[in-house]
């Protein structure tokens, strides 16, 4: 008896993307419920199913193929598209994306961004995407509402996130999310430790354990930039892939995004771990991250898919463009036009992509038993005409080298239509665009206000920030250090501790003097016995000092100083703050914390080495009231005499002002 089917597609060029690259030039596909029941020549399937098919669709000679699989993205970031471009990855991520996300990301933001992304992806023939973001359960809800298939990974990292104050909270969110969504017909829940550089070893181990416990994928970024790999070598003595292996990450079903900077041995490690890899050519090109060794990965037998990455670093979700770029880049970097031919490029975006996401049993090819995730592609438009039939691979080449996302006319996922004749059926495109425009206005206002203030940009980076401090201080120019060194041994002074370090300062100057000056400082702490550097500390200080008062002996009361840890490189801060000019200073500092008449003072003996300006003595103490300041100013004057420095030339300028007056700026931004 003839089997009943819901839909019979006929008159199609069927590209199955199965292991044999089977194709049918006059082909047909039969769908019942959520699955494919038959694929083959049109006449055979018409004879078998036409009589009892609820709907017969004449494809008009279009290509009928598996839906494309976006193997790595961050779909809610459609709402951040075009926000910050032409920046290095660290400046883009730490300087713009994360501050804006901390301010704006919410469940509502995530749902809107996801629906917007679903509309874009459906239009470009994507039926499955692999996501990593915050509030991932809301990504899952929106994707399911739109009818798309998705692997949704709840982000976990060491920093406070928009959806969690700690990594423990994120981990619990991931656990709850996985438990609620396991075995959903469209959504595969996952856990996503963001990257080795944003996660501790403990987090990597904990997320791997969670993924193993529920047998779900683990999605992460690995070896995206050379900087990441160099830092890993510097801190742990090994590259990224061996490091995460050591943490047990590969005991889980890993989906590794990027893998740009991996060698042959690391490729073997990924293969033996059965990890999937997402190649993201547009993002890697735009952020200048490098060229992933895709051909070597494929030759080794790795499952490598293709991803768009997030819309804020691409800036679109067009998988046709990604497939084409993947093929072109592979040819360029190998100097071989036969590298990554069209059938294999398309395979990466279909069956290999599904296998990389560990869902190859569900989707990725048109085969009986797999889900009905399929698309129709018109190859008759002007940009894809004429069509040749001479070579077996012509259809693949037409899609990869000349096809556009606008050629996709129809999309089905899990046996349900998401788009018919270019009309979206599950999302309201006009409403989404209007809502997105309103969000963009709010983000614009936030960034415009922030960009007007160096302090606001400093605060936006996150981390601790020590605000206004009041200091009583006095500074004198010395002929040499010996008198002070002898005086410090006197009975009137109680030395609590001493430190010796070299200070490397770079001061940023801005167009508007009211912005103050930003100092990037690296302190090299020196062991005087061994003569070696034992520790390095980096800090940012925003100096907008106002002189609140002046006492006897040129003792000053000053305020307005903001201090934050500097966790990024000098290059990062230069590109982030965009100073008009800068000056570099180097000095050798011996610092004592002392008690004088039951009052705490810092005594700095400084040798200005670059430029060479000789020796200076600074005496400083903090104060919190005018009366206290007057008392401490008097003691500071006494200390000048006790330290045999009262005859030195009094200096009321900061070091940068002395240098600024005597030396030219070292660079103009």
Residue locations for each model-derived region?
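His/Asp/Glu-enriched, well-ordered alpha-helical/loop segment
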Residues: 246-253, 295-383
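C-terminal cap of metal-dependent C-N hydrolases
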Residues: 18, 371-429
